[in-house]
Amino acid sequence: MKITIHRGLNQIGGCITEIQSLSGTKILIDLGHNLPDGGGVSEDMYESPENLDYILDGCSAVFYTHYHGDHLGFAAEIHERGVAQYMGPLAIKIMIHLNDHMTYAEKLKDRAKANLKALNEFKTFAIGRKTIIGDIAITPYGVSHSAPDSYMFLIECDGKKVLHTGDFRDHGYLGKGLYTMLEKHIIPQGIDVLITEGTNVGQKSKSVLSEQEISSQFRQIMRKYKNIFILSSSADADRLWSIYRAHN
């Protein structure tokens, strides 16, 4: 098995991982955009059709850990090239709803319509059940993240096992199940290679609040002030639930 990290070793977000078997079967884990820099600008080499053609050459499928833009960013272009795309069932529905809403915006509608055409052809998978692509087996396991329906993948190929964690956390409402899942389903199998995201690696001084703690802070603010305005992602289910709990 050959593992190629196309992007992600020297940056946060925008990670792209290639798994290729000895017989030549090739899949990608995530293919999204770079995260914007401090000025809100994001330059991406895969905006170039030639570069996208190169990374997708011989690729049988792209598996998405979740739908955030640095993981899912070229759905329409990949669809045009005839490569299968896999994502969680709820994640697909969320992205279809989001892009359907975007068709009402003049500047976004063409892109949204192209995305919808691709999303309606997405394939999905089930937790704990293998999806077979050639001689590569991919088993998804659900994890807590700010994007609902996020997954890590156990990949089996050429007698080796790779765990690709995607983005995950233990401070969301479903986070308490992370360690139980690892101890029950992952660790006993034996992992040869671990590929993980490092969003907060090296930030030991950074305080991470749980959603329960955030909800408690919301509640205190709501009791203190009469009129409260909250700006939040409409697709961050945990945060919306934290706001709802604080208000009720």
Where are these regions (language model features)?
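His/Asp/Glu-rich metal-coordinating catalytic cores
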Residues: 2-61, 70-238, 242
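Conserved G/P- and acidic residue-centered "switch" motifs that form tight phosphate/ATP-binding loops
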Residues: 66
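Terminal amphipathic helices with adjacent charged low-complexity linkers/tails
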Residues: 246-248
